[in-house]
Each structure stands twice: as structure tokens, then as C-alpha cells.
């Protein structure tokens, strides 16, 4: 979908590739995921202090409950993925393929790349998500 929206050539953001798994790093993440039995996935991006938790109509069991927990411990808003932001992300594929929870965590405020001065707050906001991703599911 992003390709059809005009993101058709390599760029610092929003280019999704010419085809699924066309980039070596995408293939590496895919292969790594296929070799493990992950209960959930966390994808980190840097903009907005938001947790995106579902993909289209896919809502794996407990995914909303876990998202709310992550939002509570981080202070981040919990939202559904905007339509134009879906379709090419690791989280989206993971949710659809495995029917397990996946989250995109948007850290920090401002335009990416974020300043290093935000690191301590981002870490403080997210350490509970990282621990919770291991222990609270």
C-alpha cells in the first residue's frame, strides 16, 4: 500500500522496499523470527510517545490488555495503528502471521532523529515495557 501511495524509491523514511523481504536486513529479521517462538514482539520507532497495538482487524488474544499495561507503566497513549501507517511493518506481519500480540512503541517527542538529551526519559518510560514484555504476558 505504501508503494502505491508514492513511496517508490529508497529514502530516509517510509520506503518499504520494492517487494517483501527485498532488503537483506528484512530477510534477516524474518529468518530470526521464524527460528524462534516469540510470544509477542516490540518494534521501536522514535516519534510520539504512542503504543500501536493492532493491525487492521487482527486483535490477538490479550493484545489490548497488554497494550493498556504498557501504556500504564510508560505513560504513553495506546492507539490503533493509523491506516496509512500499516501494511509494511514487522509488527503488522507478526500479528497477521502468528496471531500473537505485536506492538510499535513510538518513543520521545519531536521530529526524528530525536536529540540525545531525551535518552534518560525514554529509557525511564520504556524499561517497564521491556520487563513487562518478558514477565507480564
Locate each region found by the language model.
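Short glycine-rich, acidic/polar surface loops and turns
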Residues: 82-102
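His/Asp/Glu-rich mid-to-C-terminal helical/loop segments that flank catalytic regions of hydrolases
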Residues: 114-137
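Extracytoplasmic/secreted proteins, especially bacterial periplasmic and envelope-associated proteins
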Residues: 24, 28-31, 61-69, 85, ...
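Residue-level detector of structured alpha->beta connecting loops
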Residues: 37-38, 75, 99
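Short Gly/Pro-enriched loop/turn and capping motifs at secondary-structure junctions
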Residues: 48-49, 76, 86-92, 109-112
Amino acid at each position: 500500500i505504501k508503494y502505491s501511495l508514492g513511496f517508490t524509491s529508497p529514502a530516509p523514511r517510509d520506503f518499504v522496499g520494492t517487494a517483501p523481504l527485498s532488503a537483506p536486513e528484512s530477510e534477516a529479521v524474518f529468518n530470526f523470527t521464524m527460528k524462534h517462538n516469540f510470544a509477542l514482539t516490540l518494534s521501536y520507532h522514535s516519534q510520539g510517545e504512542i503504543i500501536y497495538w493492532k493491525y487492521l482487524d487482527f486483535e490477538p488474544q490479550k493484545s489490548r490488555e497488554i497494550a493498556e499495561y504498557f501504556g500504564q507503566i510508560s505513560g504513553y497513549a495506546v492507539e490503533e495503528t493509523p491506516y496509512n501507517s500499516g501494511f509494511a511493518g514487522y509488527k503488522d506481519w507478526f500479528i497477521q502471521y502468528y496471531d500473537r500480540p505485536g506492538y510499535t512503541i513510538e518513543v520521545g517527542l519531536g521530529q526524528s532523529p530525536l536529540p540525545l538529551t531525551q535518552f534518560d526519559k525514554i529509557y525511564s518510560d520504556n524499561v517497564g515495557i521491556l520487563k513487562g514484555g518478558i514477565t507480564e504476558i
